[in-house]
């Protein structure tokens, strides 16, 4: 079985990409009045005779379809493409090994561009299941066979032979029946004989009965599978047998070969499943003596195929297979006729999903399909008459309505009194003895009930008198400041959330505890609430958190509950970094989590608390040893449950709590654990309130449940998946209890230990070691991320403050002010900035300044200077501080000023085309003081007369000129750099009087593309000229149809993200040290 499932996965990977072309091929072969059917022909045990007989059946069906379409006035062509398996590649004499064969045939059809409108075949369950997955639910499939449970409830698959699901429904119905003259007992036990040599149909029928999570197993109290012939033979006369009923599958010859002439106990009933054999209804057939203890389950006979050319030499079982292929053709013809008459396209998903919940005219009469496309039929239960030695009909069963109809009310059975015996041995003692024992038992029971009631009354009285554990507030201690709440590997934890967590965590009796708000103000609990609290005190179980009592703090009442270090299960599932899927949270760990919750709930349901009422993944917590514990139980009269995604549908409709409601909540949690997705994950709905509404209001439709992807489950996962689906059944009575859930998971969990030859403690230690290694890796990884983040922060600081200042702040926490003997300071501003703002929107002004100053910043980066600040349109730069650089400060400022002026000669505004932007530049050198001012948003500021003079040099300058003081020129003369300058003459500087100033015009042997400054010297004329330029620019914009840009939320993103947002981790050494 495991090998086959691995084949399924492998072939899915190999062939899945090829099916993407199905839709185009189907469109080619299903249009313009020509429709093609793809028929897969596979030779195996399901149809051992020559495949030519199946081809004859298909051809006969095609002739019938063509005639029916012609009679309906539809002039279309219907043909079939036959694809045969390659016996040299696939030597599969058994359907149970034909997975690859079916996929290979499908690939051949696809490569040949002959993909038809519908796929007929194969009969093998494995092949059908895999091909259904690979056609991606968009292609109709009709199968003659595919009996297994894995092919149930497939949206585009139709099965024309009775599947195992129908057989289970009959057996459960018959077992429960107890109101017939010949069956007065309900049965609840059975043996199932299965040796692995059965035919294809029998293999899957018995496989369904064997599955521990199937409907049949769920309804029976006892079921044992017999796998050896000797086991079957021993049961026939074993007085200690647990059941009188044995189910097997095959014909009378198979039974005789197994049983022979051995004696059989008089209470034994053998149910022989032989559905596809109508020889029992022949007039000349006599039942052999060994069939007297046997009830034969078969299908109602059909004689239409007996004289057909293609089936004349076939065995009865093979005739049914051939008939299914033929009816598959007729079914397609029926649906094709309907769609063509309605003018609809058959290559749409609607056609693929239409083969269900209908009745069509088959070869031997009407054929009915149920809501899932499975054929409905009439099953017949036969018995051997001891008078006539003939097979007679005992009852019939209609699979469509799931109802039994008795036929022979006075059968001549071999069993005593012509009644079917009880299924359990030894239920036939004398009536007097039954009466004696019954009376004795009733008296004992009454005495026991009276004793229990008296005991319960005394305990309840004690509980009412006893005061629950109310802890004095002085025994609750806050956590120490050096105690952390939980281990966290995130470097950006929310400190506010951490503070709230601290308020809810305290210490009691030297243990860390959680304080649960009970929404109670005064602590005067009612009698019922006191009983609930006392019940909680008595619970002490490994998978349930301990309740220590209540405490009153301020005006609030808290429950004091055991603390679990790793937080809730929901948090663990969300943390894919600390608990990765591949190395830690594997399938075995998920099973152990489910097992822990099931054990805790099983104990809780058997305790006095009886029910949880608020079970969800956030109420399941994980301790330091990775053990899952349930919390927040009890106190249902204090904290009534609310509607949530975990709430059972019956409690959404009517507020209540129940054990079956807890089982539903467990199913939702199990889906979270298995898929590790959000609560109630489903692709069809994302909104929480809508999910709750759809669960509450099913309105007779298919119940709304989260996705579980049963089709892709591996073999080891399938049993758990089916268990989860049973937990969220709409009918609460169909849900298993936690005892059964615990038993099932214990068996599955035990298999892991047996395979690895290790105990539970070995597994726990191994998991903690694995977690420790993973934690070390994560700590190392987070350390690297921290260092990278620290370097990123340093780079950002260096853009705001000088490097030496940042280093001093990090090392000392402050920067000492310092006096610098000689520095050079640069000032510039935009001429006519106020006028430009008048004709621009605020966002256009921001865009303009951002474009200009980003370019200034790039120029500044190439010189040994420090950008001090920008205020409006003013730009201030200094050199020679905080790191002294000799005479370089004047050279760097001068070169920088020339490059900035050269750039401004090429700059043009987008919203005012043609308008030149004029700037004034002033430069001055001298002493100044510098230091960091303030704590919030600290800034490195300059102080002294040099700063004021540099500002005066700018304000007294002219547009597109670099106004330089005499002190700066004197420093430049002391250097080897030959700067070009002109004497401006005497200039009045406020606070300093008249001084000789200069125009910096360039540098020898280096060309700067400086703009030509305006020739007008008079200030008023300059303003008039600038106003004329703006007016011309506005006319150009209007003529070109350029509209003012609408304000943008982040104007600076226009030409790329701000540089400080582009900072990333760096490979350079950190500057932290």
From Swiss-Prot:
Query: What is catalysed by this protein?
Result: GTP = 3',5'-cyclic GMP + diphosphate
Q: Which GO terms describe its molecular function?
A: ATP binding; GTP binding; guanylate cyclase activity; peptide receptor activity; protein kinase activity; toxic substance binding
Q: What are the transmembrane regions?
A: 431-454
Coarse class of the primary localization is: membrane
Specify the Guanylate cyclase domain's residue ranges: 824-954
Outcome of swapping residue 840 to I: In DIAR6; activating mutation; exposure of the mutant receptor to its ligands results in markedly increased production of cyclic guanosine monophosphate
GO BP annotations of the record are:
cGMP biosynthetic process; intracellular signal transduction; receptor guanylyl cyclase signaling pathway; regulation of cell population proliferation; response to toxic substance
Q: Which disease is it linked to?
A: Diarrhea 6: A relatively mild, early-onset chronic diarrhea that may be associated with increased susceptibility to inflammatory bowel disease, small bowel obstruction, and esophagitis. Meconium ileus: A condition characterized by intestinal obstruction due to inspissated meconium in the distal ileum and cecum, which develops in utero and presents shortly after birth as a failure to pass meconium. Meconium ileus is a known clinical manifestation of cystic fibrosis.
Which residues does this entry assign to the site Not glycosylated?
357
Q: What is known of its domains?
A: The protein kinase domain is predicted to be catalytically inactive.
Where does the signal sequence lie? 1-23
Quick one: a GO cellular component term? endoplasmic reticulum membrane
User: Localized where?
Assistant: Cell membrane; Endoplasmic reticulum membrane
How does the record say this protein sits in the membrane? Answer: Single-pass type I membrane protein
* EC annotation from Swiss-Prot or TrEMBL: 4.6.1.2
Glycan-carrying positions: 32, 75, 79, 195, 284, 307, 345, 402
Subunit structure, as described in the record? Homotrimer. Interacts via its C-terminal region with NHERF4. Interacts with the lectin chaperone VIP36.
Residue intervals on the Cytoplasmic side: 455-1073
Would the keyword GTP-binding be found if you checked this record's keyword annotation?
yes
SUPFAM superfamilies (UniProt xref): Nucleotide cyclase, Periplasmic binding protein-like I, Protein kinase-like (PK-like)
Q: What job does the chain carry out?
A: Guanylyl cyclase that catalyzes synthesis of cyclic GMP (cGMP) from GTP. Receptor for the E.coli heat-stable enterotoxin; E.coli enterotoxin markedly stimulates the accumulation of cGMP in mammalian cells expressing GUCY2C. Also activated by the endogenous peptides guanylin and uroguanylin.
Residue intervals of the Protein kinase domain: 489-749
Extract the InterPro entries matched here. Answer: A/G_cyclase, A/G_cyclase_CS, Cyclic_nucleotide_synthase, GC-C_PK, Kinase-like_dom_sf, Nucleotide_cyclase, Peripla_BP_I, Prot_kinase_dom
Supply the name of the protein: Guanylyl cyclase C
The alphabetized UniProt keywords are: Cell membrane, cGMP biosynthesis, Disease variant, Endoplasmic reticulum, Glycoprotein, GTP-binding, Lyase, Membrane, Nucleotide-binding, Receptor, Signal, Transmembrane, Transmembrane helix
The record's account of how the chain is modified after translation: Glycosylation at Asn-75 and/or Asn-79 is required for interaction with VIP36 while glycosylation at Asn-345 and Asn-402 modulates ligand-mediated GUCY2C activation.
């Amino acid at each position: 079985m495991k090998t086959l499932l691995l084949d399924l996965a492998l072939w899915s990977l190999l062939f899945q990409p090829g099916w993407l072309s199905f839709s185009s091929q189907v469109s080619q072969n299903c249009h313009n009045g020509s429709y093609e059917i793809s028929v897969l022909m596979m030779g195996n045990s399901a149809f051992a005779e020559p495949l030519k007989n199946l081809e004859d059946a298909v051809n006969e069906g095609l002739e019938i379809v063509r005639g029916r379409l012609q009679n309906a006035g539809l002039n279309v062509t219907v043909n079939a493409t036959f694809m045969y398996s390659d016996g040299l590649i696939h030597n599969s004499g058994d359907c149970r090994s034909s997975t690859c064969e079916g996929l290979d045939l499908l690939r051949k059809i696809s490569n040949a561009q002959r993909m038809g409108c519908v796929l007929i075949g194969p009969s093998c369950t494995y092949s059908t299941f895999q091909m259904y997955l690979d056609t991606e639910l968009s292609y109709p499939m009709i199968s003659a066979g595919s009996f297994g449970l894995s092919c149930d409830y497939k949206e585009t698959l139709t099965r024309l032979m009775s599947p195992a699901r129908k057989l289970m429904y009959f057996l459960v119905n018959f077992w429960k029946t107890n109101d017939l003259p010949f069956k007065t007992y309900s049965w609840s036990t059975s043996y199932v004989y299965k040796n692995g040599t059965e035919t294809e149909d029998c293999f899957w029928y018995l496989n369904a009965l064997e599955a521990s999570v199937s409907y049949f197993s769920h309804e029976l109290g006892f079921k044992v599978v017999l796998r050896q012939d000797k086991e079957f033979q021993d049961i026939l006369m074993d007085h200690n047998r647990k059941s009188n009923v044995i189910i097997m599958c095959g014909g009378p010859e198979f039974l005789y070969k197994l049983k022979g002439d051995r004696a059989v106990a008089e209470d034994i009933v053998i149910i022989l499943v032989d559905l596809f054999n109508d020889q029992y209804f022949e007039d000349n057939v006599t039942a052999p003596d060994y069939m007297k203890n046997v009830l034969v389950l078969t299908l109602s006979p059909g004689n239409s195929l007996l004289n057909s050319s293609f089936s004349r030499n076939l065995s009865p079982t093979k005739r049914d297979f051939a008939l299914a292929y033929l009816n598959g053709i007729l079914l397609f013809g029926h649906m094709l006729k309907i769609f063509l008459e309605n003018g609809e396209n058959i290559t749409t998903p609607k056609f693929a999903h239409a083969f269900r919940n209908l009745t069509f005219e088959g070869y031997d009469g009407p054929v009915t399909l149920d809501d899932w496309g499975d054929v409905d039929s009439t099953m017949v239960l036969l018995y051997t008459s001891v008078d006539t030695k003939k097979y007679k009909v005992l009852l019939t069963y209609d699979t469509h309505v799931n109802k039994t109809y008795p036929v022979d009310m006075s059968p001549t059975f071999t069993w005593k009194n012509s009644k079917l015996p009880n299924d359990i041995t030894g239920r036939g003692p004398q009536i007097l003895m039954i009466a004696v024992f019954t009376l004795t038992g009733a008296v004992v029971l009454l005495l026991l009930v009276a004793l229990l009631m008296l005991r319960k009354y005394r305990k309840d009285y004690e509980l009412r008198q006893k005061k629950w554990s109310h802890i004095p507030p002085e025994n609750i201690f806050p956590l120490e400041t050096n105690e952390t709440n939980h281990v966290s590997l995130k470097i950006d934890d929310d400190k506010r959330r951490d503070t709230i967590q601290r308020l809810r965590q305290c210490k009691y009796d030297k243990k860390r505890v959680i304080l649960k708000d009970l929404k109670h103000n005064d602590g005067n609990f009612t009698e019922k609430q006191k009983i609930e609290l006392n019940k909680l005190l008595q619970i002490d179980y490994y998978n349930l958190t301990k309740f220590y009592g209540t405490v009153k703090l301020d005006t609030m009442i808290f429950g004091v509950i055991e603390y679990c270090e790793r937080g809730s299960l929901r948090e663990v599932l969300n943390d894919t970094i600390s608990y990765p899927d591949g190395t830690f949270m594997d399938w075995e760990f998920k099973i152990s989590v489910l097992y822990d919750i099931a054990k805790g709930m099983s104990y809780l349901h058997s305790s006095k608390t009886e029910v949880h009422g608020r079970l969800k993944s956030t109420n399941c917590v994980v301790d330091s040893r990775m053990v899952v514990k349930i919390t927040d139980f009890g106190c249902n009269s204090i904290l009534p449950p609310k509607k949530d995604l975990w709430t059972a549908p019956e409690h959404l409709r009517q507020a209540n709590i129940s054990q079956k409601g807890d089982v539903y909540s467990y199913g939702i949690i199990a889906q979270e654990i298995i898929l590790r997705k959000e609560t109630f994950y489903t692709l069809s709905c994302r909104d929480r309130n809508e999910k709750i509404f759809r669960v509450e209001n099913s309105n007779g439709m298919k119940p709304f449940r989260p996705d579980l992807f049963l089709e892709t489950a591996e073999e080891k996962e399938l049993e758990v998946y089916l268990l989860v689906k049973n937990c969220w059944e709409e009918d609460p009575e169909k849900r298993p209890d936690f005892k059964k859930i615990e038993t099932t998971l214990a068996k599955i969990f035990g298999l892991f230990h047996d395979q690895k030859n290790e105990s539970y403690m070995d597994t726990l230690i191994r998991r903690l070691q694995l977690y420790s290694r993973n934690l070390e890796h994560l700590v190392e990884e987070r350390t690297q991320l921290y260092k990278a983040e620290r370097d990123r922060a340093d780079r950002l600081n260096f853009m705001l403050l000088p490097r030496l200042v940042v280093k001093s702040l990090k090392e000392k926490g402050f920067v000492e002010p310092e006096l610098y003997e000689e520095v050079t300071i640069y000032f510039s501003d935009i001429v006519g900035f106020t006028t430009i703002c008048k004709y621009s929107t605020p966002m256009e002004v921001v865009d303009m300044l951002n474009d200009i100053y980003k370019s200034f910043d790039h120029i500044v980066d190439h010189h040994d200077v420090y950008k001090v600040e920008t205020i409006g349109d003013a730009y201030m730069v200094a050199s020679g501080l905080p790191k002294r650089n000799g005479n370089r400060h004047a050279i760097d400022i001068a070169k920088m000023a020339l490059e900035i002026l050269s750039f401004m000669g090429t700059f043009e505004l987008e919203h005012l085309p043609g308008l030149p932007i004029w700037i004034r530049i002033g430069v001055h050198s001298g002493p100044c003081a510098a230091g960091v001012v303030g704590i919030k948003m600290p800034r490195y500021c300059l102080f002294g007369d040099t700063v004021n003079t540099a500002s005066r040099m700018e304000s007294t300058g002219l547009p597109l000129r670099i106004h330089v003081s005499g002190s700066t020129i004197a420093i430049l003369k002391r250097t080897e750099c030959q700067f070009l300058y002109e004497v401006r003459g005497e200039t009045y500087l406020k606070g300093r009087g008249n001084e000789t100033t200069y125009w910096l015009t360039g540098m020898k042997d280096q060309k700067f593309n400086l703009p030509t400054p305006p020739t007008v010297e008079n200030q008023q004329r300059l303003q008039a000229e600038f106003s004329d330029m703006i007016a011309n620019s506005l006319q150009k914009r209007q003529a070109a149809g350029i509209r003012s840009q609408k304000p943008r939320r982040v104007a600076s993103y226009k030409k790329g993200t701000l540089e400080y947002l582009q900072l990333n981790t760096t490979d350079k050494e950190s500057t932290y040290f």
